[in-house]
Each structure stands twice: as C-alpha cells, then as structure tokens.
A protein has these predicted regions:
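C-terminal capping/lid segments that line or modulate ligand- or cofactor-binding pockets
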Residues: 293, 357-358, 540-541, 559, ...
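Bacterial N-terminal signal peptides
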Residues: 11-21, 25
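Alpha-helical support elements that line or immediately flank enzyme active sites
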Residues: 222-226, 231, 236-237, 427-445, ...
Length: 968
C-alpha cells in the first residue's frame, strides 16, 4: 500500500531497463511450447533431463518473480499438480542470453529446502527455455506445505544461484476435508432479501468462538480455512487477520431458480457453481490459554437488493481452524451451532445502497479473550450453497493506495467538501475524530451516478476512526455533514481499493494529451477491478459485463500483471456457460440486469485467445476450447443459411432487445446490430479454428475455419454497398477492414473510411467495439495520420474533450452522460503501445517469445517509449526523432528473439543504419510498402514509412539509428 499526496501525477512509465539432496524423480510437464526454444543448441541431450552441478561461477541469467498458478506464495491451491513459473533476468549489456535449462526443487519445509533435501520433487536439470512447468513430484494431499526454488542455466551452460525460496500450500481438496458447518445469525431467514426492498435492513452479524490452547503445548502450525457470503472479515484474538477486504472474490455461488423469469431471462443451468474460500497462516497469533476466533459478515453480492442482481440468501460463514502441536497431535476449531452470534455496529450494508455504522453498538473486545458472551445467541445452521468450495484463485481486493486531500472547503454548519484530486474507487477513512455520542456524520460520495450512502454515528469516547467495510464508492470529492468542530486535513484520507494487480507496463510520449488519456484509463480500469472481475462501472451497475471485458482485456494485459486476474475471470465466464445450449450470458458472474448481444458472449473466445497471445499459456486454450466451440455452435443456430445473425430470443419467446445489442455508446447512430452480430460470429469461429490448430485438433481447425470463411463471405455479401463502396459509417468499414476485404474493394473501402472521418471533422463516430479496432485499422491501412488526429482532438466527441472537461477517469458516453468511470473505450489504447511506441508479441510465437518492434512515428511526436514486464522478462522500446535522424532502442529479454523495423528517410538504404551491437543482428530486407493508389474514389498521399528490417537472435539492448528525421 502506498500513500499519495496527489496534486498531479505524470503518466506512469515502467522503466524496464531504466531484476546434499534426496531428490524425488519424476517427469516434468512443460507448459506453453516445446521447451527447447532458441537455446536448444546449448542443451545436452536435446532437452532431456540431465544431472548438473554448479560450475563455481554463476551464469548470466537468474530466476525471479516465482509464482504458483500465477499467484505469489498462495496459501491455498486446489490444483492437484499446480504450475510453477518464473521469469529470468539478465543485464541488458549482456547479449544473446537465454535460459538453456532449469531445475526445480520442492520440499515440505523451508528448512529442508535450504538444506537441499527436496523431499517432494527434484526435477534435476531439464534442458529448455520453458519458464512455466507443472509440478511433477510426489502426489500432493490436502494441507501439504510446498516450499520451492529454481535455478536456471544460461546460454553457455552455467547455472545461476538458487532463487530465494517461495511456497504454496495445498488447500482442502475433498469434501470430506471440511468438518465445519455453514452457520448464520438466528435473527435472519435462510433466504435472501426480497427485491422490492420492504424488509428493514439487518445489522451485520458478529460471530465468535472461544477455545483453549493448553499451557505448555507448543503450536507448530495453525491454519484457518474460511469464507463468508457475501463478504467476511476474520479476527483472531482481537486483531483482523490478513490484508484482504471485500473477501471473498465474486462468483456464481449458488442456484437462483428465478433467473428464468427476469427481464433478461437466463436458465439457471451454468456449467459450474463455486464458492471461493481463503486460507491464512495464524500460527504466530495463537497464545497459551484462551483464544478467540471471530468473524463479521456482510451481505456483498450474496444478499443484495437492487435492480441489477438477484440475491442468493442471507449471510453465512464456514470456518475451520486446524492446529498442529509439536507432539504431532492435531485439533480443529470448526464453525457450528456452538458459536455465539450478536448484532454488530454495521447497521446496514448493501453493495448498492451503502453502509451505516453506529459506534454505540460496538462491543469492545468481542473477538478477544476475556469477553463475556453470555448474552449472545447461538448460531444457527445454514444451507450449504450449491457451489463447490474452491480455493480462491484470483487476486484479493486490498487497500492499494492512500490519497491525501488536495483541497478542503468549509461550507458551514458542520459541512465540508473535500477533493482528493482524482476519481478513485474505495472509501474514505476518518482519523481521530472527537464528538459527542449520537452525533451522525454523513459522508456523501459525490458522483454523477448512484453511489450509495454512508453514515457514521459516534460513540463519544475519545478519538474515533472509521472506514467502510462491506461496499465501496466511487468519488473524487466527498461532502461531509454533521462534522464536529473544525476538519483538519489529516483527519480524512481516501483509500483506493481494487484487486491486487501490479502495474507492469507503462507508456509515455512527447504529447502530454496522449499521456493523460493513457493515465486516466489506467485509473478507470483499476477503479473497476473488484472481486477479480472487471465491472462496466464501479457504482451504478457494478456488473461483470463480458462485452466490456473482452474489448479491453488486451489493453489491460499490456499495462498490468493480470494473469491471475484473468485466469479467475475467464474461469467465471466458462463456468457461466449453459452446457446444453452453449449460450454465454452478458455478464459473468451473472447478474440479471446485464444487457448485451453476440459480442458479449464472444468473451468466451476472445479473452482466452488474448491471454494466450500475451502470456503464451496453451493451458488456457485447452481449458476453453470446448466452451469456444459450444458458443460458436450456439450462434450457428441463430444464423440464417448464409451465416448472418439477425436476432436471438430466449427459448420459446420473442426476441429481447437487451439480448441483441450490437455496438454500444457511439456519439451518434449505431451501426446495424446484424452487422456487429455477424462480425463477432466470424471472429469467434476464427478464434475457435486458430485455437484448435494450436492444440493439434485438426478436425476442429478445419470445421471452424470453414465456418469462419463462410461467415466472412456472408458478411461481405450482405453489408457491402457497391454504390458507396462502403460497409457503412459508425464502424462498418472498420469491422470490414479488420476482417479483411476483397482486394478489388480495398481502395474504395479505405477511401470511404477516410472520407467519413473527414466529414466528422476528424472525429470518431464509433461505439465501444468499433473504437477498439479503429486506430489500429487506420494505422495498418495507411491512415495513421487520421488515428493521431482522432486521439489529439479536444472537441466533442473525443478523449481530449473529456480531459478538457476535467475528467480524471474515462466516461461511458462521449457527451458526458451516465457514468464517468467506464474503462471500455480504453480498448483502443493498444494503438499507443503496439503501433506508436511499436512493441508487440508475435502471434505466431506468443508470450513474447518473439517480439516485433515497429514504431510508427506520426504527427508531431518526437519520442515515445513503452515498457513491459512480460511473462519471459523485461522488454521495452524507446524511439526519438530529431532533425538529424531517428534512434530506436529495443530491450529484448533473455530467451526471446525479435524483428526490428527501423524507419528510413527518403533515399536511405541499409547502409544508412548504424547498430550499437551488430553481433546477433542480421539484415533481412528494406520494406517499402506501396502507396495506396488513387482510383475508383480511392485515397492518395498516405504512405507507410520505409523500413530496414532486422532479425535479432538474442537478448540485450540494441540501438539502431537512421536518418529518418523529424522532417520526414
């Protein structure tokens, strides 16, 4: 967590350049490729496992960022043979390096691991450059502790030092491992709140259990497995356990038979239902004598009242504390009806309505030893949710930033307005407030969308602190009323809360507006990451829209380490699919208010594919191929004989508008819904075919490839207007060019797109899906000047217009209507990273095994840079142009190769390019893409840069200079 005194922060730029055994022998399964890669020539035995001893001199590469199932030291994993991953680091001045081999050791304790006694698994030396491998040792059981380390060999066959130890723990793998019961408060029914809001709010229950650790007994380990629905906070001996907030992550927890009767009817027949649980190591918290475990429960999404959702039931808890003593004996403390329950100070909590807290209702010491709970009631058993208990596999929500006020305005009468400088998702925290008992402080989170209320009633006993627990708000400013005395700036901070994802990519350039646009999208995206799903907006709907998610996921992966986040959310989407029909709902986890269309369900194809391209993870494709096929087959049932989709309807009903949206939120008119449906039908079939091909499913590749081609022909036959040479404005031509138009139509379609933008004064006219493709389509078809013009406009409709209006986050509508915290339009920002800066993973060698560096200098830009910590290591690009020439600097991680495109000035040749490090670099060709010639209304004057193209065979920092200066 970081504290920020915010006035104005420049866009984040991640400077990538600017980190005696008893082995258990087993075969290692290697993820994501052949394993040999570019270092195969250095591997003894062609990638077979070989014994190796350190040479006494450390190699040039070293492992770092060790993860288990993409998580850092997870406390509960229920994958029987989890995947272990790392990156390798090397000095950028050391060239041609790679990982030529690896060795993983896994032990049952850190002590054994440090002594080299890998009693669970020792892979031995395995040749290859794979940095993601599956555990291959002794079968793992529930509760097993696994400490692991890795070392790697460099291109010269020299081993690194061992990495620092990392660990994971196995969770409770079987139903029989759970001895605890689901329990709840006796004053609440088992069922959910009614949606009409007639019942009074019920206070959040407190639950506690006292137990003894006999004097003289030494606790070796104590771990608690716990979850509470909708949210819970866990306490032990008077202190909160863990940093997690708003736990657990959101899923489809349970059955809701009423779903079929909602406005957007969906059969309650999902592929899978799950309830995430968490595990915490509490060994150091136990004491001799009395101990107390406690929990506070919130409604969360499990018992929510509101138009966007349908509740499951009243709050409930399951907890199992397992204690192991030094004599080998064990003891369990489990949730059951012997636990005590009382009402707590949180008098009302609802995701949408807000939270009210009355400090007069606090019971000091309620979760600590020595408390008298004789007046408390016994807990009551609760029905177990239909969902399977499963270890939480996504990042938890946490307080990630603390912002200080930048302005405090006194309004009079105990009222203040406080500005924190930018829009965040989270809550404010009151510090050291003094006032009389019963004083009610109301906190109004100022927002353009419904945001919920928040109130704190004081107990009047000295300085008091408070922050919300069971919901979040979206705000830049708050208005306080009922404040006692003067408000001092130190008495109020804003806590930004979101899923714990790390920013690992950064962009910057010479145009401050582009930097600002990228920055406000970054903030918007974080504001919308809660419960390891991404919402459309974090206040009004808070829904995990699959359409918004699929369109922006590539941008997210370019800016964040989002592997664990998307592993979880893509799993939710697959789990929400109807296994009988293949239908994928418009949101996952499903909330009945989510409208959408074909493009929304397309997330089941698009998101796993983008994940594969970015992280190189074939397992993601393997898990989702059947789901992809199921969705494409479902769409096929709604297509006409040619392959065009008009509208879908629930089973046995008329078509529903909110199931048939095409594009969404343009500044003016929408393109044809049918055109958008058919485009995404093609895209899903195409991805299914590509996925099948990657996985060696030749029959699937042929079947879905043929279907994609049939739909493509149908699209071109149905939507092209030969009179105008266009597929229509509002994104029609953009979709067609992305798909690929017939060569004879190409000049006219490009001309139509250019003319349409010019008629709009250089502005866009696209919705969320058309905008996603617009800039890269323009760039790739000789119109990057138009893309740059669109992105640097400051008048409506444009991103710059939002900035001129003072936006610190992206808006839902171009005209400022509705939500002011919607990340969906940020999908187009891949243009900044992949085109303007010019760094992209080669789709034929995904996961940054091969990187394409191809900058597109445009407009008045004089420099740009982009950096990313990829799944293989640190990569970055930086370019500058002056009157004297052009400089391109590329950093290639160990084990990766690259193709580098160096812009050339007029009349320049290969001889005009200078290299800082020629070794390992080979010239390929001069690429001079032909001008798009005028004709039949075509365009002229748009010419790609001429490039000298080079292949780079290994890691290092490479600098290329040419004379393609600023005047070119």
């Amino acid at each position: 967590m970081k504290t920020i005194s915010l006035k104005f922060r420049l866009p984040l730029f991640v400077a990538v350049v600017c980190c005696l055994s008893v082995p258990v022998r087993a075969t290692a399964a290697v993820m994501g490729g052949t394993g040999a890669g570019i270092c195969s020539e250095f591997v003894t035995g062609g990638g077979e496992k070989n014994e190796s001893r350190p040479s006494g001199r450390e190699g040039a590469v070293r492992p770092d960022r060790m993860r288990c199932e993409y998580l850092e030291n997870p406390e509960a994993v229920d994958v029987p043979s989890p995947r272990l991953s790392w990156i390798v680091r090397t000095d950028s001045t050391v060239y041609g390096q790679c990982q030529s081999g690896w060795q993983v050791q896994v032990a049952s304790s850190e002590e054994l691991l440090r002594r080299g006694r890998a009693d669970r698994w020792d892979s031995g030396r395995v040749g290859g450059d794979s940095m993601r491998v599956r555990y291959g040792g002794k079968p793992l059981r529930s509760r097993d502790a696994c400490w692991w380390r890795v070392r790697v060999w460099d291109a010269g066959g020299r081993p690194s030092a061992w990495s620092a130890p990392a660990h994971w723990h196995m969770g409770l793998l079987g139903e029989a491992d759970w001895q605890a019961q689901w329990i709840g408060a006796p004053g609440q029914d088992d069922g959910p709140l009614s949606p009409d809001g007639t019942e009074p709010p019920l206070p959040a229950p407190l639950l506690r259990k006292s137990f003894e650790v006999a004097p003289g007994r030494k606790v070796v380990s104590a771990r608690v497995y716990v979850t509470g629905l909708g949210y819970f906070e866990l306490y032990l001996n008077g202190e909160k356990v863990g940093r997690d907030v708003l736990a657990p992550n959101q899923t489809n927890y349970d059955k809701r038979p009423g779903l079929a009767d909602c406005g957007i009817p969906v059969e309650d027949n999902f592929r899978e239902y799950t309830v995430p649980y968490l595990a915490y190591d509490v060994t150091e918290r136990l004491r001799s004598g009395e101990n107390v475990i406690g929990a506070m429960l919130g409604n969360g999404f499990y018992n929510v009242r509101g138009r966007w959702t349908m509740a499951y039931g009243s709050p409930r808890l399951i907890a199992q504390l397992e204690i192991v003593y030094d004599d080998g004996s064990q003891e369990r403390v489990v949730s059951d009806p012997t636990w005590k329950v009382a009402e707590g100070p949180v008098r009302m909590d609802q995701i949408y309505a807000g939270e009210e807290y009355d400090a007069r209702c606090e019971q000091p010491g309620w979760c600590a030893p020595g408390f008298d709970d004789s007046a408390w009631q016994n807990a009551v058993p609760r029905r177990a949710p239909y969902g399977r208990l499963r270890a939480q596999n996504g990042p938890a929500d946490r307080v990630m930033e603390v912002l200080k006020p930048v302005k405090v305005e006194k309004l009079g009468g105990g009222r203040y307005r406080v500005d924190f400088g930018e829009t965040v998702s989270g809550w404010v925290r009151l510090h050291g407030v003094r006032g009389e008992a019963g004083r009610r402080i109301e906190i109004k989170y100022l927002s353009e969308s419904p945001n919920g209320s928040n109130a704190y009633t004081m107990k009047g006993e000295g300085p008091e602190d408070y922050a919300t627990r069971f919901t979040w708000y979206v705000f830049r400013e708050v208005e306080l009323s009922g404040w006692p005395g003067e408000l001092h700036p130190g008495q109020l901070t804003a806590e930004a809360v979101y899923s714990d994802v790390e920013t690992t990519g950064g962009f910057a350039c010479s145009n401050p507006l582009l930097n600002r646009i990228d920055r406000i999208w970054w903030r918007t995206q974080l504001d919308n990451m809660h419960g390891a799903v991404a919402s459309d907006c974090p206040h009004r709907e808070r829904s995990a829209y699959t359409g918004d998610g699929q369109t922006v996921c590539a941008t997210v992966m370019h800016r964040f380490d989002a592997a664990a986040f998307y592993s979880k959310w893509i799993g939710d989407i697959l789990a929400a699919q109807n296994p009988d029909t293949g239908y994928v709902p418009n949101g996952a986890p499903w909330q009945p208010g989510c409208g959408g269309g074909v493009a929304w369900g397309a997330a089941i194809c698009i998101m796993p594919w983008e994940f594969y391209l970015h992280y190189g993870d074939r397992d993601m494709l393997a898990r989702n191929l059947d789901g992809m096929k199921g969705y494409v087959d479902y769409l096929d049932g709604w297509a006409d004989a040619d392959g065009v989709i008009y509208a879908r309807a629930p089973h046995g009903r008329e078509p529903v508008y909110w199931m048939n949206l095409g594009d969404w939120c343009p500044p003016g008119k929408l393109p044809s819904d049918t055109l958008v449906h058919t485009f995404y039908y093609w895209r899903c079939a195409d991805i299914a075919a590509r996925t099948a091909r990657v996985l060696g499913d030749s029959a699937g590749a042929q079947r879905y490839g043929a279907l994609a081609e049939r739909v493509r022909r149908a699209f071109h036959g149905r939507f092209y207007d030969p009179g105008t040479g266009s597929y229509g404005p509002f994104g029609g031509d953009v979709f067609a060019l992305y798909m690929g138009v017939p060569p004879e139509r190409y000049p006219r379609v490009c001309a139509a797109l250019r003319d349409n933008i010019r008629r709009n004064g250089g502005h866009l006219d696209t919705g969320i899906y058309g905008t996603q493709f617009l800039l890269e389509v323009l760039c790739d078809n000789g119109m990057n000047d138009l893309a740059y013009g669109i992105m640097t406009k400051r008048t409506f409709p444009s991103f710059g217009h939002w900035v001129e209006q003072g936006a610190t986050t992206m808006w839902e509508q171009w005209d400022g209507g509705n939500s002011h915290c919607h990340p969906m339009f940020g999908a187009c920002l891949t243009w900044l990273y992949r085109r303007v800066a010019g760094m992209e993973s080669d789709p034929e060698r995904p996961g940054y095994r091969h990187i394409v560096f191809r900058p597109r200098p445009v407009g008045d830009l004089t420099w740009a840079r982009y950096a990313q910590l990829t799944s293989r290591g640190e990569a970055s690009v930086r370019w500058e142009r002056t009157a004297g020439g052009f400089m391109l600097e590329a950093d290639i991680p160990a084990g990766s190769t690259a193709t580098v495109w160096v812009p050339l000035g007029d009349g320049q040749t290969r001889a005009d390019v200078r290299l800082s490090h020629p070794a390992g670099v080979s010239f390929v060709r001069v690429d001079e893409t032909a001008e798009v010639r005028p004709g039949n209304g075509g365009i002229s004057g748009d010419k790609f840069h001429r490039y000298a193209v080079y292949e780079v065979k290994g890691s290092g920092r490479y600098r290329f200079t040419s004379g393609a200066g600023i005047t070119d």
